[in-house]
Amino acid sequence: MSFFENTRKPVGFGGKIMVAMMNLGHSPVARWGLRFLNAAPDARVLDCGCGGGANIRRLLKKCPQGVVKGIDYSPVSVEKSKRVNETAIVEGRCVVLQGSVADMMFADNWFDAVTAFETVYFWPDLPRCFREVYRVLKVGGTFLICNEANGDTDKDERWTEIIGGMTIYKDTELKAYLEQAGFHEVQIHKKKSWLCITARK
């Protein structure tokens, strides 16, 4: 497995390095994307594909009286996320679990918001995963997707050649999948190659 395969599912020592790098490298696009999330101070938020936990930490700051849960299918990512958010976990404001977005262990209609930063590229069955997100969201809840790539450049295509199982979706494709899953009020925000999409249940 190449080092860059760790972007999909971090494993071993290389995976530990990768999640640390992603916490730093994805910071600018994540901060930009979070501007489009309107969440109450006491919101319940789920971060799918939580990686190294940096966005969980940002969400906890955005919702200081809320609860933030994270899910990732990489044990390395879960371990890192727990370390980064250890204080909030002890306080009962944060939970990080290992699992698949395609079959989540959460109750129906539980979250006020669900986020997915730099992760939908790797979801194996996007329609099914979007239906799962729809299931766990409350009516009126928001699903936010934030990506550094919108499939508009040759560089995007090169990444899909380097990293197995990676698909870079255009904003129009994501919008169509979201609407098929039942979402409405789909809004698309762009900044150069960056993409942020919000959708309502």
PLM segments and residue spans:
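Class I SAM-dependent methyltransferase SAM/SAH-binding core
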Residues: 44-103
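A short glycine-rich, Lys/Arg-flanked "PGG" loop and its adjoining helix->strand segment in the class I
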Residues: 127-139
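Short glycine-dipeptide loop
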Residues: 42, 137-142
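C-terminal alpha-helical "lid/dimerization" subdomain adjacent to the S-adenosyl-L-methionine
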Residues: 13-23, 142-198
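Conserved alpha-helix/loop element of class I SAM-dependent methyltransferases that forms part
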Residues: 24-43, 58
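A short acidic, Gly/Pro-enriched loop at the edge of an enzyme's catalytic core
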Residues: 102-113
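A short SAM/SAH-binding and catalytic strip from SAM-dependent methyltransferases
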Residues: 113-125
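N-terminal, positively charged/glycine-rich alpha-helical extensions of SAM-dependent methyltransferases
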Residues: 1-14
